Swiss-Prot record:
One of its GO terms (biological process) is aspartyl-tRNA aminoacylation. It comes from the Bacteria. The keyword Mitochondrion does not apply. GO terms for molecular function: aspartate-tRNA ligase activity; aspartate-tRNA(Asn) ligase activity; ATP binding; nucleic acid binding. Its EC number is 6.1.1.23. It comes from Chloroflexus aurantiacus (strain ATCC 29364 / DSM 637 / Y-400-fl). InterPro entries: Aa-tRNA-synt_II, aa-tRNA-synth_II, aa-tRNA-synth_II/BPL/LPL, Asp-tRNA-ligase_1, Asp-tRNA-ligase_1_N, Asp/Asn-tRNA-synth_IIb, AspRS_core, GAD-like_sf. Keywords: Aminoacyl-tRNA synthetase, ATP-binding, Cytoplasm, Ligase, Nucleotide-binding, Protein biosynthesis. ATP binds at R220, D221, E222, Q229, E484, G536, I537, D538, R539. This is Aspartate--tRNA(Asp/Asn) ligase. It is found in: Cytoplasm. It holds the Pfam family tRNA-synt_2.
Length: 589
């Protein structure tokens, strides 16, 4: 037996007991006759005391260094009051060592384990097995385990079945590029790794498994924008004989109970707000707004139709918008800060930023545009934006998509500057009534906003043939603190409707049969009404753990270039393997 207890287990009630611990040397302090070692495992830290009364153990303690793997036997004793460490769960006791054995020595680690070292992330990823020893990483992975376990227990109690679906599937054009796997047994043919189990879970509904879930691994060969990973984990769910409210109510109950169990210190407003897609875009410029703060967009377009200011007027005459954000109490912002905000909206596509400062002393307004307005127009803007002395008004004029993108960036930037987003608040909300399709100007065709299996709203079905851009979907996104936490929809369950949507998306009958024939045929054998959702596990745990990226809550993540620095994947393979697969590599020129 290597250990009788863990390093986080011993308490004053164990005083006088002979115990055996095993773990890593966290810290070592040598005072000659006395050597103190903090012994660590994932459960905690115990202080071990080596003294010359036990010379063999003391000699071992003289040789060990940080991260040695050590086994220690000794007697638990109460620490003197002045030596109690309130920062440790075991801080009231210590272990007086009588025997010690080095189970494995260790080289000097390239990163600090006992504290955050500030090293480059690439070093952490290369030595991930060392980085994972750190308290922060252990805390995150334990939280992840608790989240997944809670979900499994909750859904089991709700009558769901956890069913595994294949990893090797058929390649179909669902969105991002597939990861392809060549078939040795069928030369020239390929499997794909699933971007999601979307079609398979719908087929499970056809099969009669009315409540399905899976902690599903998903793969997308896409450009690694911002905080993405080529492989990720989602809670995949599907239910039969449900409408949108049934799905939303279940998920809301689950996430409310989850958060109150695993992060009880966080504030969780309930019930979750519900906003239509149109309302979210109008008020926040985003379909995943952070609702922990205000800074809502204010539409000024109708006030400025006849304005003599040509910048605003030309935009409005070309179908654009004029919208602004009131930054309360920000009249003190310097010109340098306003220039920085201008760069923020330019990153969203805007050509510039109009601004006005309402001084606190009742003095003259400073503005980049007010002097160009007609009498009364600036006063109308101030009234519409409910501005007060000491406020800063920030306005963008452009086409609606640019106004939304740029003011969304501005809103988030202001919230960060003003520290408006409470990290201890979890603000969930539902975004509903998405458009079913959007026009792809480059390809001159309609694209599905979510995926081609999303059902249109019944009351909009008549518009499919005449005005598809106005058709709303039975789709919904769960958002959390400015992130999309999960997306779902009620699905199409009739072959004729599915074929109509394929046709709208420019998928011919031949293509539909080749790519989705199994789905279309299944719908002819009694497919029930069904719907589901797929919240992302990585993103959820990242937010609950107050981490900046999903890499901090994954055991072995890849870089933004999809490289595993620890194992050097991807890597070349043996020529023999390529021959077996009938593959020849043609390098790009």
């Amino acid at each position: 037996m290597y250990r009788s207890h863990t390093c986080g287990e011993l308490r004053p009630a164990h005083a006088g007991q002979e115990v055996t611990l095993a773990g890593w040397v966290h810290r070592r302090r040598d005072h000659g006759d006395l050597i103190f070692i903090d012994l660590r495992d994932r459960y905690g830290i115990t202080q071990v005391v080596f003294n010359s009364a036990h010379p063999t153990a003391h000699e071992v303690a003289e040789t060990v260094r940080s991260e040695y793997v050590l086994q220690v036997r000794g007697k638990v004793r109460i620490r003197p009051p002045e030596a109690v460490n309130p920062d440790l769960a075991t801080g009231e006791i210590e272990l007086e060592a009588s025997e010690a054995q080095v189970l494995n020595p260790a080289r000097t680690p390239p990163i600090y384990i006992a504290k955050e070292g500030g090293e480059d992330e690439s070093v952490r990823l290369k030595y991930r097995y060392l980085d994972l020893r750190r308290e922060r990483m252990q805390r995150n992975l334990i939280l992840r385990h608790r989240v997944v376990k809670f979900i499994r227990d909750f859904l089991d109690a709700e009558g769901f079945l956890e069913i595994e679906t294949p990893i090797l599937i058929k390649s179909t054009p669902e969105g991002a590029r597939d990861y392809l796997v060549p078939s040795r047994l069928h030369p020239g043919k390929f499997y794909a790794l699933p971007q999601s189990p979307q079609q398979l879970k719908q087929l499970l509904m056809v099969a009669g498994y009315d409540k399905y879930f899976q902690i599903a691994r998903c793969f997308r060969d896409e450009d690694q924008r911002a905080d993405r990973q080529p492989e990720f984990t989602q809670l995949d769910m599907e239910m039969s004989f449900v409408d949108q409210d049934d799905v939303l109510d279940l998920i809301e109950r689950m996430f409310t109970a989850l958060c109150r169990t695993v992060v009880p210190h966080k504030h969780l407003p309930t019930p979750f707000r519900r906003l239509s897609y149109a309302e979210a875009m109008e008020r926040y410029g985003s379909d995943k707004p952070d609702l922990r703060y205000g800074l809502e967009l204010v539409n000024l377009s109708d006030l400025l139709i006849e304005t003599p200011f040509q910048v605003f007027r030309n935009v409005l005459n070309s179908g654009g918008q004029v919208k602004g954000i009131r930054a309360p109490g920000c009249a003190h912002f310097s010109r340098k800060q306003i220039d920085e905000l201008t760069d923020v909206v330019r990153a969203g596509g805007a050509k510039g930023l109009a601004w006005a400062v309402l001084p606190t002393d009742g003095g003259e307004v400073r503005s980049s545009f007010a002097k160009n307005l007609a009498p009364g127009e600036f006063a109308a803007i101030v009234e519409r934006m409910q501005a007060e002395a000491g406020d800063l008004l920030l306005i963008v004029a452009d086409q609606p998509a640019v106004v939304a993108a740029s003011l969304d960036k501005l809103r988030r930037n202001l919230a960060e500057r003003l520290q408006l987003a409470d990290p201890n608040t979890l603000c969930f909300a539902w975004i509903v009534d998405f458009p079913l399709v959007e026009w792809n100007e480059d390809e001159q065709r309609w694209d599905a906003v979510h995926h081609p299996f999303t059902a249109p709203k019944d009351e909009d079905m008549h518009l499919l043939a005449t005005d598809p851009g106005k058709v709303r979907a039975k789709a919904y996104d769960l958002i959390l603190n400015g992130y999309e936490a999960g997306g779902g929809s009620i699905r199409i369950h009739r072959r004729d409707v599915q074929q109509q949507i394929f046709s709208l998306l420019g998928i011919s009958e031949e293509q539909a049969q080749a790519q989705f024939g199994h789905m279309l045929e299944a719908f002819e054998y009694g497919a029930p009404p069904h719907g589901g959702i797929a919240p992302g596990i990585d993103r959820l745990v990242m937010i609950l753990a107050d981490e900046p990226t999903i890499r901090e809550v994954m055991a072995f993540p890849k870089t933004q270039q999809a490289v595993d620095l620890m194992t050097n994947a991807p890597s070349p393979v043996d020529e023999r393997q390529l021959k077996e697969l009938h593959i020849r590599i043609v390098m790009p020129e």
